[in-house]
Amino acid sequence: MATDRTIWQLSGGPASRSYADVFVRHAIGLLGPGDPGRWHAERSDEDFDGSFVRRFACEMKVGDVVLLRTGLSKIRAVGVVAGDYEYLNQFDDVNGWDLQHARQIRWCELPVEYEFGSSVFGANPPRFSGVGSEEVVDFARRFVVSPPTYWQEAALPALPAEEPMLDEPPEALRNVVAEVNDLYPLLWDRERFGDHPTEDELVAHFVVPLLRALGWPPERISVKWRYIDVAPFTALPRTPENCRLVIEAKRLGAGVEGALEQAKAYVQALGTPRDIVVTDGVRYRLYAAAQDFAPAAYANLVRLKRPALDLFNRLKRP
């Protein structure tokens, strides 16, 4: 057995805001916080909220085994480290997470998540760490030597290209974007602001102003119509036929992608296919009804990139 390989666990993100799919799709392992910049030997652990990034960059070696952890006791995939530490800015916004610290990892995704049955990674496992549980170490060592093992030599996929930043938002949206960027740091500061704003506040202060700036008049923007958080209408009266799309709002920083199923239920109740937007007031992800609700457009108002223009165009009043 490969007893010389260190066994690591790497979090795939919380259930409500997971990024495990990104790891498997791109044969990559990612870690944050990435916005403080590339790690190097002169950087302090304090710059990265602890020693996780330093250990990820320095102690992990090519050939080590990585378990893609989900929750306290499950794993989604087993991987083998295939590359040295890199800082990849194309992963600066993974479902809202800044995960630029990277290593290429060849993953073997399990048919179903493997449940160890107890909190083998600890009661509050860190985002990245070495594995100490004998049960888990034994599982990992046996897995990588058990056939099939061809996945450990598979060609690595090309990494996605970095999306260019948007130098200036469209003129109609400049005030809205500026206000969001001004308020965003404050809303996260519990000492200065207090409790995080509710979904209703985010709708009132961010979502509706964005729609107004995109040309929708107030009488054609409903709030809590048929339980839908926000719905713009192409014409009056407010009927399912005139509903342009369904917007489902979540609290700030929540996993907006996890709200898709709830929004799809609202669309089904309408009886007519409509695109869906899920948002926390800052991040907006659109799912296209014509593509079986596949993700089709995205914008992060505090990290605007050129593809955001597509989302703005889709949200404009026709």
Q: Whereabouts are the PLM-identified features?
A:
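Compositionally biased, charged N-terminal/linker segments
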Residues: M1-C58, L110
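Short, flexible loop/turn elements at secondary-structure junctions
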Residues: G12-P14, D35, T70-L72, G83-Y85, ...
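Switch/connector loops and helix/strand junctions flanking conserved nucleotide-binding motifs
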Residues: Y19, R76-V78, Y87-Q90, E113-S118, ...
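Short secondary-structure boundary/capping segments
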Residues: V24-I28, G83, N95, K264, ...
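A short, conserved, highly charged catalytic patch centered on acidic carboxylates
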Residues: S51, K61-V62, L156-D275, R283-P318
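Short coil-to-beta transition motif at edge beta-strands of beta-rich domains
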Residues: F56-R69
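Aromatic- and Lys/Arg-enriched surface recognition patch
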Residues: K74, V80-V136
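Long, low-complexity intrinsically disordered regions
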Residues: A123-P157
